[in-house]
UniProtKB/Swiss-Prot annotation:
The gene is SEOC. One of its GO terms (biological process) is phloem development. Coiled coil: none annotated. Signal peptide: none annotated. Pfam families: SEO_C, SEO_N. It comes from the Eukaryota. This is Protein SIEVE ELEMENT OCCLUSION C.
């Protein structure tokens, strides 16, 4: 018994040596998991007994490519099938042909070798069994089966079909183990050499057995047809029965061998994966304090459990090296989230954008609410990842739970709250959440560090630009009045007064941005700018300003901050207590006025009539807030000089003065 075991081990060592000599990967990459899913779908459908069951999958085969290779997937399948369909007589020829296949597949990784061979098996047996499978309910399929001399009655070859089904399931299961092993990021962590060496040896041998078993299945195609040809054959029923049992037995034997291998290999792969994840988890804890040469180590670690092409931009699959030497913004969010669209506008559609955007990249990392992605969430992700201009994680549902837990526990990611983690070109974490910063300033915030945010707040105070920059064009000198209310009577009065003031010659733009939406047509008829999108972005922007300022107030609680107070008052505005609010300014300035006081002052401006011409709206509102002088005052101005003056104001109260012509 020990002698036999030694001989078997010696043979396995020889096989491994031969396999390694024929293994020369050139960097080409195939989505083995997706292709295996299609293979499993095809074979499980044609091998099932219930014809009425629908095919519960969408066709993804057209999206599968062989990357970094001139060889297309269909051509690779064809090239392999030519060798697999050649007849082999005896075990020795099958072994030799198996090694020929490995020479043919030398440029591919181990998981791709196994999956491509199974792809040939699915294409061949799928084409043979599909007409047989559908013949009961489809006359055309029955005719095709007869023309190809295929047996329509499944009972005649059911034992063989069951054995084939057993073997195919076993091959698929062990191939999943190979794929899982190939996805383990050994570059990011170290594994015990003995454990790794033993597992690698089993991966090689298992791949060999999958290829050899698939080749054996292909060699039994003539038997599959012989039940239909039995009437023309001289073989007796007994002889056919013996051949049937022999063929089924051969497939069953291979299937049980692979099932036993699967149990051992699956445990080994799980152990390797667990050890690597534990070490990666330890590295993640130190990721903020480690020194890096660039951002590649950090990004490879964060997306370590993905394949060589873990990212995508639109439908193009890309590697992490494409964001080297750039500032990287990791956008963590549910798919989708409202700030995504504002972020898109601020970083890509903002009028002030220049070539700065070439120096940074956004990588969207969608995180679902539950541990398992729903079909709806996958569809939403596919739509937005193929529509939005930034990079996204490809197949985020395959991300490691270790990484996701790290985001939630160490980075404090919360559901329904998108966050934007900034990694500079040297791999340093310069801002653990730049979301509010980007929503406020867009590309002006580059390089999106905490220190840059402090600089921006020193440069910007309370102004119309701060409120509207990036969501509505503001020009220095043009006066804007933003107003809001839930009182329809007050809004109508405000709009009526504003139109009268505009008729006096005041250049004034009105923007309605209350929390309550009004009829859009009615607002347009009143010459009022109203946009539900602008309304949504305005309040989203205010919330971002509040959060950004709040972080600084926590650091310096005793220092007064006008911006924070003004924004907080707007967000907490009591529409039941007050009729409305207004903010007036000309770009670099802004003044907030209570709604009741606003209309009261506007009525004064209307009463002034032409005497207010020459004043700006903001200036007129400020003057109207002052009480007029109790005593009458007179200012004598030469006639020619008065012709050039648009308005004359009282030196004491600043109210506009009526004009009279006096003759001396």
């Amino acid at each position: 018994m020990n002698f036999r075991r030694d001989i078997s081990a010696l043979n396995e060592d020889i096989i491994v040596e031969q396999l390694l000599r024929s293994h020369d990967p050139d960097g080409r990459w195939l989505d083995s998991e997706m292709l295996l899913q299609e293979v499993e779908t095809i074979l499980s459908f044609v091998l099932q007994n219930d014809v009425s069951r629908p095919l519960l999958t969408e066709n993804c085969i057209t999206t599968i490519e062989v990357f970094d290779s001139k060889e297309t997937l269909p051509y690779a399948i064809f090239r392999i099938s030519v060798q697999m369909l050649c007849p082999c007589t005896g075990e020795n020829e099958i072994r030799k042909r198996t090694m020929v296949l490995f020479d043919l597949l030398k440029e591919y990784r181990w998981d791709a070798k196994a999956v491509l061979v199974l792809g040939v098996l699915a294409a061949t047996y799928g084409g043979l069994l599909l007409p047989v499978h559908l013949a009961i309910c489809d006359p055309v399929a029955a005719s095709i089966a007869k023309l190809n001399q295929l047996p329509i009655e499944r009972t005649k070859f059911r034992p063989w079909l069951e054995s084939l089904n057993l073997l195919i399931k076993a091959m698929v299961d062990v191939t999943k183990c190979i794929i899982k092993f190939e996805k383990i990021p050994f570059k990011q962590a170290k594994l015990d050499n003995n454990i790794l060496g033993e597992t690698l040896s089993n991966i090689y041998l298992t791949t060999y057995r999958v290829v050899k078993s698939a080749l054996t299945c292909m060699q039994q195609i003539p038997y599959f047809k012989q039940t239909q040809q039995a009437k023309k054959s001289r073989k007796t029923a007994a002889e056919l029965s013996i051949e049937s049992r022999r063929a089924a037995g051969e497939l069953s034997s291979l299937g049980y061998q692979l099932l036993n291998i699967h149990t051992r290999l699956n445990k080994q792969v799980e152990d390797c994966s667990t050890q690597i994840e534990e070490e990666i988890n330890q590295r993640l804890r130190n990721i903020n304090i480690e020194t890096h040469q660039d951002n590649q180590d950090v990004l490879h670690l964060l997306f370590s459990l993905q394949d060589d092409l873990p990212l995508q931009q639109y439908s193009r699959q890309i590697s992490i090296t494409e964001v080297q030497d750039k500032v990287t913004l990791l956008l963590l969010s549910k798919p989708p989230v409202e700030p995504l669209f504002f972020l898109l506008q601020q970083l890509y559609d903002h009028p002030s954008n220049t070539n700065t955007e070439q120096n940074y990249e956004i990588i969207w990392v969608p995180i679902p609410s539950s541990q398992k992605w729903t079909d709806e969430e996958k569809e939403i992700f596919d739509f937005y990842s193929n529509s939005l201009p930034w990079i996204s994680v490809r197949q985020p549902w395959l991300m490691s739970s270790t990484i996701l837990n790290f985001f939630k526990q160490e980075w404090h990611y919360k559901d329904n709250e998108a966050m934007l983690v900034v990694i500079d070109s040297n791999g340093r974490f310069v801002n653990m959440n730049a979301m509010d910063m980007v929503l406020i300033w867009g590309v002006k915030a580059y390089p999106f560090s905490v220190s840059r945010e402090d600089e921006l707040w020193k440069e910007h105070g309370w102004s119309i630009n701060l409120l509207l920059d990036g969501i509505h064009p503001t020009f220095e000198g043009r006066e804007i009045c933003i107003f809001g209310s839930e009182n329809l009577d007050w809004i109508d009065e405000f709009v009526s007064l504003a139109r009268k003031i505009q008729n006096l010659g005041f250049q004034l733009e009105l923007i309605y941005l209350s929390n309550q939406r009004r009829d859009e047509r009615a607002m347009e008829e009143s010459s009022i700018l109203f946009s539900p999108t602008l309304q949504q972005l305005f309040w989203l922007r205010l919330e971002s300003i509040e959060r950004s300022k709040l972080k600084r107030i926590v650091i310096e609680p005793s220092k007064p901050d006008r911006v924070f107070e003004e924004v907080r008052n707007l967000l907490d505005f009591d529409y039941g207590k007050h009729r409305g609010w207004g903010i007036i300014g000309n770009g670099s300035t802004a003044e907030t006025v209570d709604g009741e006081k606003m209309t009261e002052r506007m009525r004064k401006i209307v009463r002034w009539g032409e005497y207010a011409k020459g004043l700006g709206f903001t200036e007129a509102i400020e003057i109207a807030a002052e009480k007029p002088c109790e005593l009458s005052h007179t200012a004598v101005v030469p006639f020619e000089e008065a012709l050039t003056m648009k308005v004359v104001t009282c030196e004491k109260c600043k109210w506009p003065m009526k004009r009279f012509v006096a003759y001396q």
